[in-house]
């Protein structure tokens, strides 16, 4: 329908991997993805890693050419449904257990003036969210390392 007209390949991009009308991974972050724009990987493959693998393959392909190229990589992370590899989630469960008691609050850092200063919990109970951010950071690092190796 109309939404498909707005997909990247109809807006000047040569390649669109995994981009659909959904702003989130409809079937979750682990293969099978049930995404018409991305073939399923091995069962249990993590989407953030897969998108990085695809981006690295494109860097390899396009860097053989002399013309510059533009790549836009948008991870679905950290959108719901929250999910990450279990070893990463366990890492942040362990870190969370080492933090002070759950009732400890502190003033939220303000980067601009705000009328209502709020307090936030020191101990956040979001190990899966933290694991997703960690995975995204790791994958951005992989892609940057690939780009650096191509200089």
Which sequence ranges carry the predicted segments?
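Active-site-proximal cap/lid insertion segments
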Residues: 3-8, 15-151
């Amino acid at each position: 329908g109309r939404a498909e007209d707005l997909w990247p390949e109809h807006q000047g991009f040569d390649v669109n991997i995994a981009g659909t009308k959904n702003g989130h991974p409809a079937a979750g972050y682990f293969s099978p993805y049930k995404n018409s724009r991305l073939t399923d990987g091995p069962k249990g493959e993590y989407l953030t890693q897969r998108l990085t693998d695809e981006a690295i393959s494109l860097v390899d392909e396009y860097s053989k050419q002399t013309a510059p190229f533009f790549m836009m990589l948008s991870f679905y992370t950290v959108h719901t449904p929250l999910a990450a590899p279990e070893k990463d989630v366990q890492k942040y469960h362990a870190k969370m257990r080492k933090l002070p008691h759950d009732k400890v609050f502190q003033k939220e850092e303000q980067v601009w003036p705000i009328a209502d200063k709020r307090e936030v919990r020191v101990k956040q109970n979001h190990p899966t969210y933290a694991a997703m951010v960690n995975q995204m950071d790791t994958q951005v690092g992989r892609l940057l390392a690939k780009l650096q190796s191509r200089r």
